[in-house]
Design a protein with these regions (language model features):
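Sec-dependent N-terminal signal peptides
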Residues: 3-13
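N-terminal "domain-start" segment that seeds a small globular fold
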Residues: 17-45
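Short, internal strand/loop/helix patches
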Residues: 102-140
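Structural microenvironment flanking redox-active thiols in thiol-disulfide oxidoreductases
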Residues: 67-108, 119-123
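Thiol-/selenol-based redox modules, centered on thioredoxin-like
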Residues: 138-178
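Short active-site neighborhood of thiol/selenol oxidoreductases, capturing the structured segment around
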Residues: 44-66
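Short hydrophobic alpha-helix segments
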Residues: 46, 124, 154-156
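Short loop/turn microsegments at loop-to-beta-strand junctions
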Residues: 30-31, 52-53, 140-142
Length: 178
């Protein structure tokens, strides 16, 4: 029983991360990365230099990621003519699975990228959050907003208590910056 309660406590901590203040990340400059899309195209973050970039870290089995996907498409449709790009980075899954379960299922108009080893996702993980977990796991269902200068202006980590399914906070920050 004690083991069960301990595991329950640890798992609830893992899924109750708070959204970090935007101020915590304003000095963080994102390093360029290069990943293949589900269509086989190589996509570099540098390709979006001069644009705002919304990045969502996902997996096909993550229920929070799946719920947010249609809202990411809405953000893309609303903002792509306003110098804003949207990307999903899927962590450690096959191209065929991701294409079917994310790109096609949600009819996404923007690139879905494959982070086969989780290295890019892990590079965004704050070092002070759940240090015992793999860095790429911490970033699942997270959203980032990178400004045209390559600096993080918004980061939300999964918070099941205050889950922002419609991405209201992300859109609010994007509107402030535009």
């Amino acid at each position: 029983m004690k083991i069960f309660i301990g595991l329950l406590l640890i798992s609830s901590m893992a899924f109750s991360q708070e959204t970090k203040s935007n101020e915590d990340y304003k000095t963080v400059e994102v390093k360029n990365f290069s990943l293949k899309s589900t269509e086989g195209k190589t996509v570099n973050l540098a390709d979006y230099k001069g644009k705002f970039v919304v990045i969502h870290i996902a997996t096909t089995w993550c229920p929070y990621c799946n719920v947010e996907a249609p809202y990411l498409e809405e953000i893309y449709k609303e903002y792509h003519n306003k110098n804003v790009a949207v990307l999903i980075i899927d962590v450690k899954e096959s191209k065929a699975l991701v294409h079917k379960k994310i790109k096609e299922r949600f009819k996404l108009s923007f690139p879905v990228l494959l982070d086969a080893e989780g290295i890019v996702a892990a590079s965004f993980a704050p070092k002070d959050v759940l240090p015992e977990l793999a860095r790429d796991e911490i970033m699942l269902a997270s959203n980032l907003l990178i400004d045209p200068q390559g600096k993080i202006q918004f980061m939300s980590l999964l918070d099941t208590k205050n889950f922002d399914v419609k991405l209201v906070h992300l859109k609010k920050r994007l509107d402030e910056l535009l």
